[in-house]
Every structure is written in structure tokens, then in C-alpha cells.
């Protein structure tokens, strides 16, 4: 029942922590420090405490800052730097989207939330359709074999959206309002 669910949830988080620990210390990746899991068996509850660097999520940042073209280019370069590290470590993030990008107080963009990230070996042996549909590469959506390039597709889609008044690519222009 509930205990099995929570135990499975914690195991998935432990996988994420292992990935984040492997890539910590790189400029454009959220810095994970450590975590603690506290089980409360009498209440069938768990506390999961995660210590990371303090950052602002990209959506929150965008509520108080207008992203200039120069900042969007910087965002792309910073996340490409993060993806280069992921490529070296054979990690596919699989969920590049604004909610998983963070900004520090110097304006550096960082990739975070490796909750559904997988190593290349695991992904190739067991394909799954995980991610956010708006940013999902066609091969992931179609459950076809995929590799690390799916993250570049998602990043490109996100950058396109920032540079085109929040409009996703491949939508017919007839869906736009006259003021768009």
C-alpha cells in the first residue's frame, strides 16, 4: 500500500540524487549538496530534506524580468554547457523546460531537476515516454529509440518560445490573435 508507494518514491529520488552528485560542481548545473530521508513508520510518512544552492526558477525570474534576446542567447549557451557535461557523463535529462531551469543572483542559468534523467545505457534498453509534451522530441513521443539529442530538441523548442511571444513552433499561424 502506502508504504510500498513511498519506498518506491524514495528509491526514484535516490537515483536522482546519484545523478546530481555525479555532476555537481559544474557552473551551469544546480549544485546538489546532500539529502536526508527520515521515515516515520508510525504515521506512514517520510520527510525528504534536500540541501542545494539557493536559486530562482526561470518562470519566477521571468515574472520580474523581461528576457532580452541577449539573455535568451545566454540561456541557450549556459544550458548547452550543462548538456555538454551531461553528454560526457552519458546522462539524458529528458525534461528540458523553463520549470527545470534556474537563475542565480549573477544571472547565470542552471539546469536542475534530474528526476527523470537516465543514463544512456538505461534509456536505450528501456524506452519510455517521459517528459513534457510541449518540449518533447518526436522520437520520445513516438516511443522510438533516442539518445542525448532529445535534450537539444527540447532546449531549441524552449528558446524558440522565448523569442516568439511564448508561441510554440509548428502551430498554424491561424491560431494567433491579431495582437500577437
Question: What is each PLM-predicted segment?
Answer:
Residues 87-103:
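Catalytic-loop of the protein kinase fold
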Residues 139-149:
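Conserved end of the kinase activation segment
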Residues 75-76:
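Activation segment signature within eukaryotic-like protein kinase domains
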Residues 43-57:
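Conserved short submotifs of the Hanks-type protein kinase catalytic core
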Residues 126-139:
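Conserved activation segment of eukaryotic-like protein kinases, specifically the C-terminal portion
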Amino acid at each position: 500500500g502506502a508504504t510500498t508507494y513511498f519506498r518506491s518514491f524514495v528509491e526514484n529520488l535516490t537515483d536522482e540524487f546519484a545523478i546530481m552528485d555525479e555532476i555537481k560542481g559544474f557552473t551551469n548545473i544546480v549544485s546538489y549538496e546532500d539529502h536526508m530521508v527520515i521515515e516515520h513508520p508510525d504515521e506512514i510518512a517520510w520527510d525528504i530534506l534536500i540541501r542545494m544552492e539557493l536559486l530562482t526558477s526561470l518562470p519566477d525570474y521571468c515574472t520580474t524580468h523581461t528576457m532580452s534576446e541577449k539573455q535568451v542567447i545566454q540561456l541557450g549557451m549556459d544550458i548547452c554547457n550543462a548538456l555538454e557535461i551531461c553528454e560526457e557523463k552519458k546522462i539524458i535529462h529528458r525534461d528540458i523546460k523553463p520549470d527545470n531551469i534556474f537563475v542565480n543572483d549573477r544571472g547565470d542559468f542552471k539546469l536542475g531537476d534530474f528526476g527523470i534523467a537516465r543514463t544512456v545505457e538505461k534509456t536505450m534498453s528501456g524506452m519510455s515516454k517521459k517528459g513534457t509534451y510541449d518540449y518533447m522530441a518526436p522520437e520520445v513521443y513516438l516511443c522510438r529509440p533516442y539518445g542525448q539529442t532529445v535534450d537539444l530538441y527540447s532546449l531549441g523548442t524552449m528558446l524558440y518560445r522565448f523569442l516568439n511571444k511564448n508561441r510554440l513552433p509548428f502551430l498554424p499561424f491561424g491560431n494567433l490573435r491579431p495582437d500577437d
